[in-house]
Amino acid sequence: MPAFSCAFPGCRRDLLVIVLVVFVGIGLPIEASAPAYQSHGTEGSHLTNITNTKKAFPVLAVNYEHVRKPFEIALWILLALLMKLGFHLIPRLSAVVPESCLLIVVGLLVGGLIKVIGEEPPVLDSQLFFLCLLPPIILDAGYFLPIRPFTENVGTILVFAVIGTLWNAFFMGGLLYALCQIESVGLSGVDLLACLLFGSIVSAVDPVAVLAVFEEIHINELVHILVFGESLLNDAVTVVLYNLFEEFSKVGTVTVLDVFLGVVCFFVVSLGGVLVGAIYGFLAAFTSRFTSHTRVIEPLFVFLYSYMAYLSSEMFHLSGIMALIACGVVMRPYVEANISHKSYTTIKYFLKMWSSVSETLIFIFLGVSTVAGPHAWNWTFVITTVILCLVSRVLGVIGLTFIINKFRIVKLTKKDQFIVAYGGLRGAIAFSLGYLLSNSHQMRNLFLTAIITVIFFTVFVQGMTIRPLVELLAVKKKKESKPSINEEIHTEFLDHLLTGVEGVCGHYGHYHWKEKLNRFNKTYVKRWLIAGENFKEPELIAFYRKMELKQAIMMVESGQLPSVLPSTISMQNIQPRAIPRVSKKREEEIRRILRANLQNNKQKMRSRSYSRHTLFDADEEDNVSEVRLRKTKMEMERRVSVMERRMSHYLTVPANRESPRPGVRRVRFESDNQVFSADSFPTVHFEQPSPPSTPDAVSLEEEEEEVPKRPSLKADIEGPRGNASDNHQGELDYQRLARCLSDPGPNKDKEDDDPFMSC
């Protein structure tokens, strides 16, 4: 032990020296020369020196090239998230400047910094944009697309998306071609097809820019779905026009057959994309039917099938955006019925996170690509392009709305038209399409410069001023509160009611076709795509059950669920009673009777269309009157049973019947005080309730269904007795006691020290 303690300081110094030597020699090669071995031979002897060189084991090494790409991607994402976080931490800034504007400014600063240090700034590559950054944004928009507003306004959306985009493309292309023919502009070499190609690139409204701005101003649902739906559905028109004019530019000549094939190509691209997306959506729904034992992989099927739908559409040169929208819309109701609540939460937040990161990166790369260049500036061409974008948008919206309002029930007001026209923002899709132009195109750099200028003008000027304009014009905002169960149930009820009205009138509108589609979906589609679907439950009851469960889950998650359980004493007084069930045979017989009585009237009403020259027969009028009388009688019986139940709830009986009754009982009302003597106090007789009847006791021979009455305690009050002179006073006493027994009891808001009756 002493020897060890003496030697310990020396060991510590040696260990320190070893550590210093290792850190000094990190990554440095250390050469060691081995001793020379000499070999002597009798014949041809020679001397050979063998020098062995070896490296020390590197404790710490740096190899940046090995992780360069993923490391830089992670740094870009981290930068985007930090900018997004800092933006929302400054409320004054976020209230004035849209998030997209700030991100573009950050991209400009980062691109300038990269260029200052002598590096080449990265450019938003079209393949990276279309295959990696755009799909999450479109999938998020399509999966959570509000179906009801979209379907109710799909006609208006298609008019703006198809006809409006065609108008913008040809209007801008034609006027720009006329501008280029002026010699002072210096662009006389630009032909018509090149101008039309540029017009098709700039004419489309960008969904990324629209989402970034309209989500912050909280505009009303109608205007939002019109602008956003147009930005989603105009992709097919943009793709067809871009490919068409690019191909015509290479060929040089255009025939009538080429124009006809271009029109056919539009329908193939749009409808083909929808078909591909719907197929993958049904596959995702069918796959989710068998994931009850492996819940952890449920979200992956949603993401993978959606991305495969997009890639398959792009592979066949179809509209990938429409494929993603169709896939999300088709799969959502079936997938959410099969997956667990945790998987639904995972899908929701992952899509929101993924789309938010992609949107942030797109705007930052727009700023960086602007610095990277190259640019070709022409003041006349660029300024004219910006002005024509505004003019064509305003004229197109006003002209199309004038025609659309003739067919709409809810008209688009002047304020709505202004917001729709002012909200036509351009974004990264236009830049990526311009970047796809070949380097040999003589106008490529000028087109890119004009496109970037239009994007900056729409995002900065229109995006920053649209919120003050909405406040100034007092445009209706979106309702933030979610509809209650009562509102949604009545909305569903009104849909069925309007379907019946359309059937009676003989006019088959969208409510009729919606009912047909829902019936087909419930009868055939859900049977194969939803696991354990209860088809025997009525649709309205199933909808109410679903909404009630959804609201209960929301209340539990928010911590607003009140305590509704009864007390322990009340629970002890509840006696469990076996509820008899109706047999299948008897239930089918009841259904047959109800169907025979209700369906006949429905068939009679639908058998003929409305005509003011046609009168109903007398027997049909008698049948209608008989049905009304039956319904009135059933309603009266229901009200009587409700009154009996309320009386039985508030009628009290003395606990000890054998206790001597006092000589005088005092009954005090709020209006007056009256004292009853023992002789004048009326007698109350009580009858025991009869035992409850079972469903087997229901007679099926009657055509109408009797409302079952709840057994209650009945009280029979004898009238006052006395001579003729006291009849009036006795009747008053009798009425007061009857009021006492039939009154529902004291108000809960009254104080406890003021009882209703005291004995």
Swiss-Prot record:
Biased amino acid composition, Basic and acidic residues: 707-719
Modification after translation (UniProt): Activated by cAMP, protein kinase A and protein kinase C.
InterPro entries named among the record's database cross-references: Cation/H_exchanger_CPA1 (IPR018422), Cation/H_exchanger_TM (IPR006153), NaH_exchanger (IPR004709), NHE-1-like (IPR001970), NHE_CaM-bd (IPR032103)
Modified residues (Phosphoserine): 641, 648
MF-aspect GO terms: potassium:proton antiporter activity; sodium:proton antiporter activity
Record's subcellular location: Basolateral cell membrane
Pfam families documented for this protein: Na_H_Exchanger (PF00999), NEXCaM_BD (PF16644)
Transmembrane stretches, start-end: 15-34, 76-95, 98-117, 123-142, 150-169, 196-214, 226-244, 262-282, 312-330, 353-372, 377-398, 447-467
Glycan attachment points: 49, 338
Topology feature Extracellular, residues: 35-75, 118-122, 170-195, 245-261, 331-352, 399-446
Topological type in the membrane: Multi-pass membrane protein
Chief subcellular location: membrane
Gene Ontology CC entries for this record: basolateral plasma membrane
GO biological process: regulation of intracellular pH; sodium ion import across plasma membrane
Keywords: Antiport, Cell membrane, Glycoprotein, Ion transport, Membrane, Phosphoprotein, Sodium, Sodium transport, Transmembrane, Transmembrane helix, Transport
Region annotated Disordered, chain positions: 681-759
Note: Inhibited by amiloride and 5-amino-substituted derivatives and activated in a cooperative fashion by intracellular H(+).
Role played: Involved in pH regulation to eliminate acids generated by active metabolism or to counter adverse environmental conditions. Major proton extruding system driven by the inward sodium ion chemical gradient.
Family: Belongs to the monovalent cation:proton antiporter 1 (CPA1) transporter (TC 2.A.36) family.
Protein name: Na(+)/H(+) exchanger beta
Organism the protein comes from: Oncorhynchus mykiss (Rainbow trout)
Source species taxonomy: Eukaryota, Metazoa, Chordata, Craniata, Vertebrata
